[in-house]
């Protein structure tokens, strides 16, 4: 828990316990003789170790009963101004990564609210002068995904306005509806990327494996739920006109107290 106090022996004990084949996840990708490869893995690697039960279950964080506020400082050069140099972020925990619909739905909402042309959250914050650069982040590579709205080049005293603008904008979207073209564009964009499976310079097998871990690490019976995403994309297309996305905003962004306001200010 306190890295500077970690002794060398405790470090070795931790490594022996958790960096052991019994606590590993092994997958094979490609056209191969599976029996031959598994035999090789056993003979050259796994047979050198005894199977040892390792309790490495990742537990859910207890939900907050109210939003938490965190203030931290970061260093700037002596000649830099503290004005317009604060970072503000509004963060909410969004279910778990084992919910394949939420896993993708908030990818779509991140696009529609913060990245699409005329994205309402981004526009509202910029129009209010709360920061000079607004971005969104949706991290669904962890057990409890986090949706964030981030304002750069803001000021500490704008925190209340930052929260007010976000929540007022979201309430208006729930009441009057989200831009359906933006939702469809977001779904089409993410579905195209999924079908294309173009990972640039990264090996496809590696990237597929990393996607497996988004669910496999937390439920060993569900390694492939995010690899079988076409039915989920079809479901999301059907929900565009039903109020489904507005209900998600109400439940996970407005009514949800499991979140934080983080202020990173210069010193």
For every predicted segment, state its role.
Residues 67-77, 194-198:
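Short, low-order "capping/linker" segments at domain edges
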Residues 1-63, 83-105, 111-267:
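Charge-rich, well-structured scaffold segments of protease-associated domains
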